[in-house]
Amino acid sequence: MTVHLHHIPFVYMTATALFCAIALGCSHRMVVEEPTVSLVTPAQAVDLSRTAMQDLNNFSFELTHPQGFTTLAGSLEMTKAGGIVTSNGFDINAEAKIGRAFVRVEAIVINDKTWMTNPLTGMWSQVAPEDSPFSSLDPVKLVADILGETQNGRYEENEQVSNELIILGQIPAITLTAIVGEVQREAMPDVSLTLDAQSYLLKKIVITGIAQPEDESNTIRVITLSNFNATVSLQPPS
């Protein structure tokens, strides 16, 4: 067989180029598939979140109970609540049970004044703050207390998903006084914190376990935060 030597350089160059292309492709895939490594520790991330949340003027929140409920003053068993929080108060809508009756209640708190709807008639009236079942509710303090008291913080196994950091830990039940009122003081429920990986704003809190005396061990409270620094203002009911 005759070998044409003038073909060898071309064949060699082609093979070399092909090898480089394959190598670059593999290298690119390796970079893309490399797991994300957090640049801060869980404790640092929680501290950064606390600072970020302190700088907010307002946000929206929602409280749900995949398991259980929260007992408020007046034997009100709250199952769901949501509203807006500003620097001078909040507006909350809640769904609850009184005995076997299902009721909806709305309350507006502006500075030192509180208005609330009658659970049976839906009519608004101004009430003394201490007479409101939401008298202990302070979402701003709640967020600060949870972020300030999270213990044994650790990243979830897949801690960064869709630009979120998920931190697991425990909190003293007394930390939740600003939302549940009466607490089982010695209890230490589990907590999961979902943070935005860029801004460190707190997006979701999942509290699992006993926080109130009436709670079961499988009680789950989920607090979702959103609409950070949206343009909102609180107004008294008309």
Where are these predicted regions, by residue range?
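Hydrophobic lipid-interacting interfaces of membrane-associated proteins
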Residues: 64-70, 97-101, 112-121, 210-214, ...
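N-terminal leader/targeting segments and the immediate start of mature chains
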Residues: 20-84, 157, 230-238
